[in-house]
Swiss-Prot record:
Keyword Ribonucleoprotein: yes
Residues where Zn(2+) binds: C32, C35, C50, C53
One of the record's GO cellular component terms: cytosolic large ribosomal subunit
Designated gene of the protein: rpl37a
GO molecular function: large ribosomal subunit rRNA binding; structural constituent of ribosome; zinc ion binding
Name of this protein: Large ribosomal subunit protein eL43
InterPro entries attached to this UniProt entry: Ribosomal_eL37/eL43, Ribosomal_eL43, Ribosomal_zn-bd
Role description: Component of the large ribosomal subunit. The ribosome is a large ribonucleoprotein complex responsible for the synthesis of proteins in the cell.
The entry's keywords: Cytoplasm, Metal-binding, Ribonucleoprotein, Ribosomal protein, Zinc, Zinc-finger
NCBIfam families: eL43_euk_arch (TIGR00280)
Length: 85
């Protein structure tokens, strides 16, 4: 049951399984990219705050890093490396 026990038997099992996966990722702590500590928590939709270095950043709605953001960051890093050569 876990985090979706608050819904009881309502909404169906498959929907509760999807919500469970989302809520677990939403409420978990993430590693801060600035200080490296596991203190990044979600404050609101897309707003993430580090309790250690007190930085507030914009991220994904349910996870700190979205897959598209990771793709863009790696492309930018690759282009910078090509520019430096």
């Amino acid at each position: 049951v876990g985090i979706v026990g608050k819904y009881g038997t309502r909404y169906g099992a498959s929907l509760r399984k999807m919500v469970k996966k989302i809520e677990i990722t939403q409420h978990s702590k993430y590693t801060c990219t600035f200080c490296g500590k596991t203190k990044m928590k979600r404050r609101a939709v897309g707003i993430w705050h580090c309790g250690s270095c007190m930085k507030t950043v914009a991220g994904g709605a349910w996870t700190y890093n979205t897959s598209s953001a990771v793709t863009v960051k790696s492309a930018i890093r690759r282009l910078r490396e090509m520019k430096d050569q």
